[in-house]
Amino acid sequence: MKIANNTVVTEFILLGLTQSQDIQLLVFVLILIFYLIILPGNFLIIFTIRSDPGLTAPLYLFLGNLAFLDASYSFIVAPRMLVDFLSEKKVISYRGCITQLFFLHFLGGGEGLLLVVMAFDRYIAICRPLHCSTVMNPRACYAMMLALWLGGFVHSIIQVVLILRLPFCGPNQLDNFFCDVRQVIKLACTDMFVVELLMVFNSGLMTLLCFLGLLASYAVILCHVRRAASEGKNKAMSTCTTRVIIILLMFGPAIFIYMCPFRALPADKMVSLFHTVIFPLMNPMIYTLRNQEVKTSMKRLLSRHVVCQVDFIIRN
């Protein structure tokens, strides 16, 4: 595509993770494996929670939504990345870039807020158990779910508005494997200081505050659990520990990316790869499958499926 001073950029060229064919092949295989685990794993969690009438506590509503967000989030980047590995020229249209950027921040922002809601749920369940049924009633839970989806939308639309107002008339090469605000704004034909500052406040500072708030809330819960002498102490400790792991895995890369928008770092691509492809696998592998009730329900569901298949084969 020829680019002159008066030419409007209509597409971006993605430079990808690496130019090495051997490394690209290795990464392609690894990402394909991750993706084939992420989608079935998260949808199995959703189906298990939806089909078991015993999993009605607020925790399972939140886990089901977390699985849906993870599956959707991985769908935004991974499939196109796999196709690009097989293409000589990795091109994404301007509209496609904006669309990808919107859904990344919509789903990512919603997931961050969901983790805050889940921390509040654990605080009520562990530190204020007598108030659990009144505070975390179905109406309140659905209101919080609506609020976090709206919060993710507002966060994302701010990013999109920032991009749509920028003129692009020069270079069109993105040094990454997907579209994100940090790389796109560097290609605009105007001074980016104010935009990058707004980006720090909208993404970086919000991510950092959520991260610190989550760590503080789980620190309070862990202190409360350690002082308690109850049969469920070990289970509560284990639950909180896994959630702290999820928080570190999700917010660590996000803080690294969005708190330093003014300069490119050598580790940017690997951090982005972890955040967009590998992290969504953490929900089924670390989070939900540590829940005994979900595992038991999943085993019953799979057993019924096997029995139905065997019965069908015998009858035919």
Curated annotation (Swiss-Prot):
PROSITE patterns per the UniProt record, alphabetical: G_PROTEIN_RECEP_F1_1, G_PROTEIN_RECEP_F1_2
Domain of life from the UniProt record: Eukaryota
Residue intervals passing through the bilayer: 26-49, 58-79, 101-120, 140-158, 196-219, 236-258, 270-289
Keywords from the named record: Cell membrane, Disulfide bond, G-protein coupled receptor, Glycoprotein, Membrane, Olfaction, Receptor, Sensory transduction, Transducer, Transmembrane, Transmembrane helix
Gene Ontology CC, one term: plasma membrane
Family: Belongs to the G-protein coupled receptor 1 family.
Keyword Glycoprotein: yes
Source organism per UniProt: Homo sapiens (Human)
Cellular compartment(s): Cell membrane
Protein name (record): Olfactory receptor 4N4
Protein's job: Odorant receptor.
Pfam families according to UniProt: 7tm_4
Membrane topology: Multi-pass membrane protein
Main location: membrane
